[in-house]
Design a protein with these regions (language model features):
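Negatively charged, low-complexity tracts enriched in Asp/Glu with abundant Ser/Thr
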Residues: 1-13, 72-75, 80
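Short aromatic-glycine-(Arg/Gly/Cys) micro-motifs in beta-strand/loop hairpins
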Residues: 14, 20-44
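Mixed-charge, Lys/Arg-enriched low-complexity segments
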Residues: 39-101
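Compositionally biased, intrinsically disordered low-complexity segments enriched
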Residues: 6-11, 35, 53, 93
Length: 101
């Protein structure tokens, strides 16, 4: 699932893309990897680990944003790829981790 947000980095307006990659390695568990892009450029987040929960992936993006002067406009969210409905439900349930105060 790929989402885009309008936002700013150090006061400069730009579009940020979040690409969520979920890999079902077994029927009982999923692993998630998340990429943050500005344009076509992938930003290096703190870890490159595969997380066992989507919530942990989103927390990592939040911490990266906080330390790199990045803000997202939550109302500008746009899904730009095909997605499984369950992925959207799971993302909506966990996205509080991305928009902490």
């Amino acid at each position: 699932m790929t989402l885009q947000y309008q936002g700013e980095q150090y006061g400069k307006s730009t579009t940020f893309t979040i690409r969520i990659i979920g890999n079902n390695l077994s029927k009982s568990s999923s692993n998630y990897q998340i990429d943050l892009l500005v344009g076509d450029k992938k930003l290096p987040t703190f870890t490159s680990e595969i997380h066992q929960s989507l919530s942990n992936c989103l927390k990592e993006i939040y911490l990266f944003r906080k330390h790199n002067g990045i803000t997202f406009n939550e109302s500008s969210e746009k899904i730009v790829s095909l997605y499984v409905p369950y992925d959207k439900v799971l993302y909506n349930y966990n996205k509080y981790a991305l928009f902490r105060a």
